[in-house]
């Protein structure tokens, strides 16, 4: 079964796990994120801050802060949508509003535009660019950006994403696949 199809049929617990993975990969490697999820999977539904931090120690660069992000986000989502992520994500008519909610909602900790895009793409939604340091460096190297620095505002993220979308059209590569191609060229691997 194709990856996107698996995600479209995943239950809410699996979607929550994927959101946690994206919280873990912010400021860390994809491998660190995967290992961190493995370490806390059994705690995602109800683990305390202390239990999560203990499980992450030696696995993640920021065990205490990431544990706090999980607790705050879980509590917010339990109140907002009873952790029914599929239903909540489907409630948005506009895909940009969906990402804005993840990136800007104060109750969701640890996600900016990059990781919100990462999560949405990983759960099978299309039209979002994952503008990590590898992608930004590639865009800088081919002259599409003046700097490889991450976009610091929503407006800059959207403008950079639009440049990637235009570049995808120019080179005739699917927009939703281009960042993965560029990422794998820089890292030498595809993890998920």
Model-derived features with residue positions:
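Structure-specific DNA junction-binding interface
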Residues: 1-61, 66-68
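C-terminal accessory module of base-excision DNA glycosylases/AP lyases that mediates lesion recognition
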Residues: 1-7, 67, 82-100, 106-192
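Short, hydrophobic/amphipathic alpha-helical patches that form generic packing surfaces
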Residues: 18-27, 72-75, 121, 180-187
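Short alpha-helix boundary/capping elements
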Residues: 24-32, 44-45, 78, 127, ...
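Short alpha-helical scaffold segments that flank and stabilize functional sites
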Residues: 36-39, 76, 119, 171
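Alpha-helical ds-nucleic-acid-binding substructure associated with the helix-hairpin-helix region
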Residues: 39-109
């Amino acid at each position: 079964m194709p990856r996107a199809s698996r995600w479209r049929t995943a239950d809410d617990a699996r979607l929550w796990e994927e959101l946690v993975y994206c919280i873990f990969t912010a400021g860390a490697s994809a491998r660190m994120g995967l290992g961190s999820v493995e370490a806390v999977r059994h705690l995602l539904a109800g683990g305390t801050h202390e239990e999560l931090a203990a499980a992450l120690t030696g696995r993640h660069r920021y065990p205490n802060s990431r544990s706090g992000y999980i607790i705050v986000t879980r509590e917010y989502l339990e109140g907002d949508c009873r952790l029914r992520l599929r239903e909540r994500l489907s409630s948005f008519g506009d895909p940009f509003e969906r990402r804005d909610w993840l990136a800007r909602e104060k109750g969701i900790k640890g996600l900016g535009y990059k990781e919100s895009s990462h999560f949405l793409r990983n759960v099978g939604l299309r039209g979002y660019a994952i503008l990590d340091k590898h992608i930004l460096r590639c865009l800088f190297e081919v002259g599409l950006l003046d700097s490889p620095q991450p976009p610091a505002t929503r407006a800059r993220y959207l403008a950079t994403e639009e440049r990637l979308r235009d570049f995808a059209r120019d080179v005739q590569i699917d927009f939703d696949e281009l960042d993965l191609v560029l990422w794998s060229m820089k890292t030498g691997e595809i993890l998920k």
